[in-house]
């Protein structure tokens, strides 16, 4: 296996179970546990998280689960690797009743690594110091919430100059834009947060709302090149373009982009061209569009059968002309946009045993991406990893030999995974949301 220097190929599980049942007298040769591929766990067996496989690992819950979230870029600097970490998220809940939902700003801080500082000796003074250190290293969470009627399907954050905003798709069939500056301010100040929660949160309203879609939707993306330009797609197959206007408002083109025949599942603006975007749909297709053309004629390229079933998610690489897709068929596919007319992906990976729910390219490493699935797996991949046939290397475990060479890491331990994002300012840090809550982690592989 030829791998990049310093990169481990890991198939450890991150299942955070409490204990492992093991009979030393019957212990046989160790094997790597492969979810969905090997024999099921025996009665009394449990998976144990291998903390040595993680540089960072933290979990958080917010009450009602969140179907979607986005990372809010901050002013703490780029390429942050020094621990403890701080980060900001904007998320929306899926509560049991429509009136119980919230749009939330989360500040997670004091996030230490998994490797504790070594301590020697066991006298009382050192034990007291260890207890104090443990208390000081507890992760912290501040939460500012505003009421939102209706479950939130998707949240995407953008900066309009110095103003952070969130685009919010909800089950009530509206897309709203919320200003986030006040929420960001109060999660940094406990006293201001208390005043906000007591006196202000109920008064926070969207700065703009669009009810022109014919129903609810999930697809939403801010342009990375034109501040304020927005795309929204619904379950009725329509995509609308939002153009910012003076005074902090938007002009939404009532003419939808025509092409898909079923629900539009995801949208991605090109990172290099102002007017080009990609879409994927439950009609199994991926389409490339150019907004300079009339909406009825804007579809320039189509792969009609990109997956065997719904195409759920796409991610457009910021560094290479690649589009990544994940579908109900559990497949991950990499498309070279220079060869998109061929209708064939340049790579296909079938590790997930259930629909893929989220995909995203690493913001700094051009060949690395992550995916989550309804099989409760998060997988990390590197296109640059391949076996060197001249090296003579072979996998000692037959289960590992059957794995894709590019698979770096399999993380487990979540329930009903919905979305993941790499932190753009903290290399290698992944955040996911699931029914079981939020997880922030970094593996030894990326």
From Swiss-Prot:
Protein's UniProt name: Glutamate-rich WD repeat-containing protein 1
GO molecular function: chromatin binding; DNA replication origin binding; histone binding
Cellular component terms per the entry's GO annotation: chromosome; cytosol; nucleolus; nucleoplasm; nucleus; protein-containing complex
Entry-annotated residues carrying Phosphothreonine: 10
Task performed by this protein: Histone binding-protein that regulates chromatin dynamics and minichromosome maintenance (MCM) loading at replication origins, possibly by promoting chromatin openness.
UniProt-listed Pfam families: CAF1C_H4-bd, WD40
UniProt keywords, alphabetically: Chromosome, Nucleus, Phosphoprotein, Repeat, WD repeat
Subunit relationships: Interacts with METTL18. Interacts with CDT1; origin binding of GRWD1 is dependent on CDT1. Interacts with CDC6; origin binding of GRWD1 is dependent on CDC6. Binds to histone H2A-H2B and H3-H4 complexes.
Composition bias, Acidic residues: 121-136
Region (Disordered): 1-29, 111-141
Subcellular location: Nucleus, Nucleolus; Nucleus; Chromosome
Gene Ontology annotations of biological process type: DNA replication; nucleosome assembly; nucleosome disassembly
Positions where Phosphoserine occurs in the chain: 119, 122, 344
Repeat (WD) residue spans along the chain: 212-252, 259-299, 306-345, 351-391, 412-445
């Amino acid at each position: 296996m030829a791998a990049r220097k310093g990169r481990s190929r890991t198939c450890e599980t991150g299942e955070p179970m409490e204990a492992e049942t093991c009979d030393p007298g019957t212990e046989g040769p160790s094997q790597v546990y492969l979810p969905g591929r090997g024999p099921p766990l025996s009665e009394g067996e449990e998976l144990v998280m291998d903390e040595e496989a993680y540089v960072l690992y933290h979990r958080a819950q917010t009450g009602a689960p969140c179907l979607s979230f986005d990372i809010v870029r901050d002013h703490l600097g780029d390429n942050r690797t020094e621990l403890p970490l701080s980060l900001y998220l904007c998320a929306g809940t899926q509560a049991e009743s429509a009136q119980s939902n919230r749009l939330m700003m989360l500040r997670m801080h004091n996030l230490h690594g998994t490797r504790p500082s070594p301590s020697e000796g066991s006298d009382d003074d050192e034990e007291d110091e260890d207890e104090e250190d443990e208390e000081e290293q507890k992760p912290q969470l501040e939460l500012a919430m505003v009421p939102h009627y209706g479950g939130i399907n998707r949240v995407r954050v953008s900066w309009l100059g110095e103003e952070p905003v969130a685009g919010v798709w909800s089950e009530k069939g509206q897309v709203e834009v919320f200003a986030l500056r006040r929420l960001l301010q109060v999660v940094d100040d406990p006293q201001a947060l208390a005043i906000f929660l007591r006196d202000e949160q109920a008064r926070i309203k969207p700065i703009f709302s669009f009810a022109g879609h014919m129903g609810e939707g999930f697809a939403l993306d801010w342009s990375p090149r034109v501040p304020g330009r927005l795309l929204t797609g619904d379950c009725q197959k329509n995509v609308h373009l939002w153009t910012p206007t003076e005074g902090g408002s938007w002009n939404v083109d009532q003419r939808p982009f025509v092409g898909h025949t079923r629900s539009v599942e995801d949208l991605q603006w090109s990172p290099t061209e102002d007017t080009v975007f990609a879409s994927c749909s439950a009609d199994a297709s991926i389409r490339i569009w150019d907004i300079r053309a009339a909406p009825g004629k804007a579809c320039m390229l189509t792969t009609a059968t990109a997956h065997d079933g719904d195409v759920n998610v796409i991610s457009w690489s910021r560094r290479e002309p690649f589009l990544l897709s994940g579908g109900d068929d559990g497949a991950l596919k990499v498309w070279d946009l220079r060869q998109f007319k061929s209708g064939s992906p340049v790579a296909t990976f079938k590790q997930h045993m259930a629909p893929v729910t989220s995909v995203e390219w690493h913001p700094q490493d051009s060949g690395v991406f992550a995916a989550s699935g309804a099989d409760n797996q998060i997988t990390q991949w590197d296109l640059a990893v391949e076996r060197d046939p001249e090296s003579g290397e072979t996998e000692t475990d037959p289960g590992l030999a059957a794995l894709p060479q590019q698979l770096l890491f399999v993380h487990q331990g979540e329930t009903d995974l919905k979305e993941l994002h790499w932190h753009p300012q903290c290399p290698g840090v992944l955040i996911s949301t699931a029914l079981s809550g939020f997880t922030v982690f970094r593996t030894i592989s990326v």
